[in-house]
Amino acid sequence: MNFLAHLHLAHLADSSLSGNLLADFVRGNPATHYPPDVVEGIYMHRRIDVITDNLPEVREAREWFRHETRRVAPITLDVMWDHFLSRHWTQISPDFPLQAFVGYAHAQVATILPDSPPRFVNLNDYLWSEKWLERYRDMDFIQNVLNGMANRRPRLDALRDSWYDLDAHYDALEERFWHFYPRMMAQAARKAL
């Protein structure tokens, strides 16, 4: 899962959206640096990552990547799940339009920015102003996201080529998304993530 899915599942679970978004920027035990609700959001994010990576649908999808891109398949798939969530948002969350949800999420996350790591603050400067969460529905934007990550981290250069794996297996990936994401939503609503 990437930004949008973590925020959405956190909302469904009444967990800290701030902590769920911040989690990738925090190493070790967050309890000494953040309030309890943010800490619980960080831990929820970590649990979601482990659960998602071990889902049979996700493990199967990783196998569809070519040898030269399989190493970056988990990252590519996380971005792709956000694509499907953004694309199908009106079906998934008919009572909370995406633009309104993004505004709500932004307001929640903004409260922790003064005490956040600089890299997280930098991400937030772009995430909201450039409307990444809404633009995830556009596959051209997904390609730009993958290229951007490859540019920032040369060891992830294979992300550029992973676009072709997504394109080749688009329909099957979308089908897998519909298999597992509603289950994860139900787990979040039961606070079982």
Swiss-Prot record:
This entry's Enzyme Commission designation comes to: 3.1.4.14
Query: Which terms does the record give in the GO molecular function aspect?
Result: [acyl-carrier-protein] phosphodiesterase activity
Key words, A-Z: Fatty acid biosynthesis, Fatty acid metabolism, Hydrolase, Lipid biosynthesis, Lipid metabolism
Q: Can you tell me which family this protein belongs to? A: Belongs to the AcpH family.
Which enzyme class?
hydrolase
> Which catalytic reaction applies to this protein?
holo-[ACP] + H2O = apo-[ACP] + (R)-4'-phosphopantetheine + H(+)
Q: Name one GO biological process term.
A: fatty acid biosynthetic process
Q: What is this protein called?
A: Acyl carrier protein phosphodiesterase
Q: Which InterPro entries match?
A: ACP_PD (IPR007431), ACP_phosphodiesterase_gpbac (IPR023491)
The job of this chain, per UniProt, is described as: Converts holo-ACP to apo-ACP by hydrolytic cleavage of the phosphopantetheine prosthetic group from ACP.
**Which branch of life, at top level?**
Bacteria
Q: Does the record carry Hydrolase as a key word? A: yes
| Claim: 4Fe-4S is one of the keywords in the record | no
